From Swiss-Prot:
<keyword id="KW-0233">DNA recombination</keyword>
<dbReference type="Pfam" id="PF02732">
    <property type="entry name" value="ERCC4"/>
</dbReference>
<dbReference type="GO" id="GO:0006310">
    <property type="term" value="P:DNA recombination"/>
</dbReference>
<feature type="region of interest" description="Disordered">
    <location>
        <begin position="1"/>
        <end position="135"/>
    </location>
</feature>
<dbReference type="InterPro" id="IPR033310">
    <property type="entry name" value="Mms4/EME1/EME2"/>
</dbReference>
<feature type="compositionally biased region" description="Basic and acidic residues">
    <location>
        <begin position="38"/>
        <end position="48"/>
    </location>
</feature>
<feature type="region of interest" description="Nuclease-like domain; forms the post-nick DNA binding interface and is involved in DNA recognition and bending">
    <location>
        <begin position="70"/>
        <end position="366"/>
    </location>
</feature>
<dbReference type="Pfam" id="PF21292">
    <property type="entry name" value="EME1-MUS81_C"/>
</dbReference>
<dbReference type="GO" id="GO:0003677">
    <property type="term" value="F:DNA binding"/>
</dbReference>
<keyword id="KW-0227">DNA damage</keyword>
<dbReference type="GO" id="GO:0048476">
    <property type="term" value="C:Holliday junction resolvase complex"/>
</dbReference>
<feature type="region of interest" description="Helix-hairpin-helix (2HhH); forms the pre-nick DNA binding interface and is involved in DNA recognition and bending">
    <location>
        <begin position="388"/>
        <end position="503"/>
    </location>
</feature>
<dbReference type="InterPro" id="IPR006166">
    <property type="entry name" value="ERCC4_domain"/>
</dbReference>
<protein>
    <recommendedName>
        <fullName>Structure-specific endonuclease subunit EME2</fullName>
    </recommendedName>
</protein>
<keyword id="KW-0234">DNA repair</keyword>
<dbReference type="InterPro" id="IPR042530">
    <property type="entry name" value="EME1/EME2_C"/>
</dbReference>
<feature type="compositionally biased region" description="Basic and acidic residues">
    <location>
        <begin position="1"/>
        <end position="10"/>
    </location>
</feature>
Amino acid sequence: METKQERETGRSSPDPSPRKLIRRAATWEISDSDNEEETNKPQTESRKGPIVNIEATDQLLGVQKDPAQQPDVEEKTKNLVLPPPTSTTPSPTRRSRKKKTPEQVAAEQEQAEEKKRQRELKRQEKAQKKELEKIERERRKETNLALKLLRPDQCGKYMVVKVDAGLLEDAGSEDVLEALRVAEYNYSIEPHSVPQSISWRREMPADWTCIEGMDMKEEEEDQLLVLVEPKSYLSSVRTYAQAPYYFCVGNEMEEIPGSVFSIPAKNPHKKVTLVIIGLQEYRWCERLSRQIQRQSLDAAEGRDSNKDQSATRATRQQIQEALVFLQLHYNTEVLCLDTWKELGQHVCAVTKSIAQRPFRKHWEAQTFSFCTSAGSWRGWGPRGVLTGLPLTWRRQIQQLNRVSPAMAAVVSQAYPSPQLLMQAYSACGSDRERMSLLTDLRIPQDNNTGVTQKAEDPREVADIAQEGDQVPGRERRIGPDLSRRIWLLMTSKNPELVLDLNS
């Protein structure tokens, strides 16, 4: 009974304590029935929104509530839930993949293999390109090293002058050997098939690499120099004068004993040069001896002997005819010298020419050094200067004889390309007008000295033609000669035409 009364008094007490009214659980107790409800009603729980603690929210906002109403609020908040959202997005459905056919799988595999092959081919091409570039660099390096041995200042070291032992019988041969020693050329004394002759041989180092496109051979050169006595040469000329037609038939001249004309026929693979020392002196002495003989004899006997001697000696006309015959039929030159010293100088000059022959042929086959090659990244000078076609065109004009950089600059400024010059030629009415088209182009002069401007570097004469109108004083022109040569250069179809009449 007391317990019930105490409960009734506690409920009817007007001012109960807040601690007794609000009781908070330290922990949440979950019973077995809750689990059963969750399993039985999964959809209803998922639809319920999150539970909001209004009491904690009011405390944060500073709202004071009536303590008498707090138990009811607590009971309401336990079952209070947020309404479900009005717009719900449906969960994405998993896309079902279509099963590929075997043909599609095979096509995809083939496409993947094709891409793999393409990548492999590109990789191989790239590696091959690098290997070719490496080989090209090595080849250029070897070529440059080989060209160093063939430069004009180095090529003479590998030439050997072969002198026949019979040539040393004359006392003047010492002048020839002394000239070779002064020029620092190697020589050797060896017996030759042709007596009193000189030949040349090139001896390259063992580690020298042959350059592609260069005709190099480590053997005797095709030049042969033969020393001929004046008496033997004049005797051969008299024999030729007596039977000129007999000499022109094949190699019949080989049967004539003592004839120097048979030497070129016996050596067809050689470029033979006949050297005669003291021919004029010998003929003068021969003429003097005949005069002495005529004076010692009687008048009648002298006339008879004069007829006999005139029939046996060679005249100047016969000597000239023999020279023409040797030049035309055997491509043989005859060199008349006065002293052995001149012969030594000639041998040194021929040695130098033979030594430089491969180097000259190699550079003649190359393009101009001022042209930019296809694979080169460097131009001619920095940006902004004259490059490419204008520079090549200017240098081409400057290749002509007696053409200064200033003259070439004037022509290239008036007609910046060869095609423009050809169009100007086609616009002319006659050949005379075309020939004199460039005659009146003025060459500018220096303001201070009045001398025509000169420039070693074509970059320094880029604006020479533009300054010509402002230069006072006497002015030079291109002139008719250079105008005619340029016209012939651009229009002539004759490869053997000589442009410079003064050369």
